[in-house]
Amino acid sequence: MSITAAQVNELRKATGAGLMDCKKALTETGGDHEKAIDYLRTKGLAAASKKAGRAATEGLVGSYIHAGGKIGVLVEVNCETDFVAKNENFQGFVKDIAMHIAAASPLYVRREEVPAELIEREKAIYREKAKESGKPAAIIEKILDGQINKFFADICLLEQTYVKDPDKTIQTFLNETIASIGENMSIRRFAKFVLGEGLAKKESDFAAEVAAAVGQ
């Protein structure tokens, strides 16, 4: 059966699992919402669902400075208690997220933060490209949905493929960490700084250097 975007979004809101994980769960369970939740729980991807409503107001502002001081990242990750904020696993998660941001250069934490005008501009570009193919309107809209999801996966931190484990997204990594630690967590915001950004300088692929360092 065909799984709709509405079904995926509903399951995502209920469990906090990643979009692709939700789609797979619905596909495996024939579109049954409750069975899909159980499927995600067996995979350890929805263990955070019962914790999702709890306030995460403690946490840590972590940092990562790439070798040579050419790239720097600050990221705020929240948790429920100061006790967990001092936990080595939590602090390790924050460091890993900062390193990922340095390598992958997301622009937003989640898709809800992406300005509507930017989304519409991207849709217009994809729609025009699809029209040139001569495909039916219904097919074009399906292609458009796929292209926009790829767009979000490129620029939204939670939907990016984790640089240290290409088999999972940052959302999945977050869910697994929540399940392991036992508290709700949230990646609130981040900032990335590149030495000399905006100034005339010799070209150098700093992001590739960071990615290589992360993979070590």
UniProtKB/Swiss-Prot annotation:
Stretches for region Involved in Mg(2+) ion dislocation from EF-Tu: 81-84
GO cellular component terms given for this protein: cytoplasm
UniProt keyword Flavoprotein present: no
SUPFAM superfamilies hit by this protein: Elongation factor Ts (EF-Ts), dimerisation domain, UBA-like
Entry GO MF terms: translation elongation factor activity
InterPro entries reported for this sequence: EF-Ts_dimer_sf, Transl_elong_EFTs/EF1B, Transl_elong_EFTs/EF1B_dimer, Transl_elong_Ts_CS, UBA-like_sf
Coiled coil: none
One Pfam family named in its UniProt record: EF_TS
Keywords: Cytoplasm, Elongation factor, Protein biosynthesis
Main subcellular location: cytoplasm
Record localization: Cytoplasm
Protein's job: Associates with the EF-Tu.GDP complex and induces the exchange of GDP to GTP. It remains bound to the aminoacyl-tRNA.EF-Tu.GTP complex up to the GTP hydrolysis stage on the ribosome.
Family indicated by similarity: Belongs to the EF-Ts family.
Name of the protein this chain belongs to: Elongation factor Ts
